[in-house]
Amino acid sequence: MAGSSRRFTDAGYELPKYMLDAHGKSLFRHSVESFSAYFDRELFLFIAREIGATAEFLETELRTLGVKEHQVVMLDAPTSGQAETVVRGLEGAARQAGTDADQPLTIFNIDTFRPSFRYPDLFELGAVDGYLETFIGSGANWSNVVPAEGNEHRVVKTAEKQQISEYCCTGLYYFRSSQRFRALFDAEVKALGASGAETYVAPMYNRLIAHGGDIRYSVIEPKDVIFCGVPAEYEAFLAVEPTS
């Protein structure tokens, strides 16, 4: 929610995309409801910019949803990409809480829906350094993972917007350590130098892998994830009759 929703603005939409309605609910609510199984046991962090009274919108939606523990961090400037957005959000959350405790980190996009999400049971979540959720697909617009030979749902390489395998990422990323994520980001920024390149999350796993990190992946059916990141996807979602 720290982006500008430019493609939606260019298409004539006046509200930020996460405020847009679909089947009687905002896209924000559709996305966050994906994780309703964890509303009473995990801390949720929402990172946004103050566009169109976003802070008030978030608090109203979160009360309606019943998310037990949450923090909202409002950024005052655009970032270089999703990875920096997460880091700035973690820093803001630490300032709010008065502590910088290390904890597991799950990252997800507010314009994507994963109805009835559950963490995978293919491996022990707390024992791996990270995992990426994938589906079988194609196209150079996705992040990808390359599985290890012999599989075991182990990852040997990740890439952003390069078709290096059929395993396309849904945008759900898990790291066992939030502090390690921040260190990985610092290393990524140093490597990018003054190029001004966008900072993506998926390629950061390669640094963990290079140092012996245990990175896994899960696979879901394409029908189990819904994307609304561009106007055409949103309009396609509007055209689908709700199932309940």
Regions found by a protein language model. Give the residues of each.
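Conserved core of the sugar-phosphate nucleotidyltransferase
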Residues: 113-195
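Conserved N-terminal catalytic core of the sugar/cofactor nucleotidyltransferase
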Residues: 7-9, 20-21, 25-103
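A structural signal for short hydrophobic beta-strand segments in well-ordered beta-sheet cores
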Residues: 19, 144-148, 217
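Conserved alpha/beta core of the MobA/IspD/sugar-nucleotide pyrophosphorylase nucleotidyltransferase superfamily
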Residues: 168-244
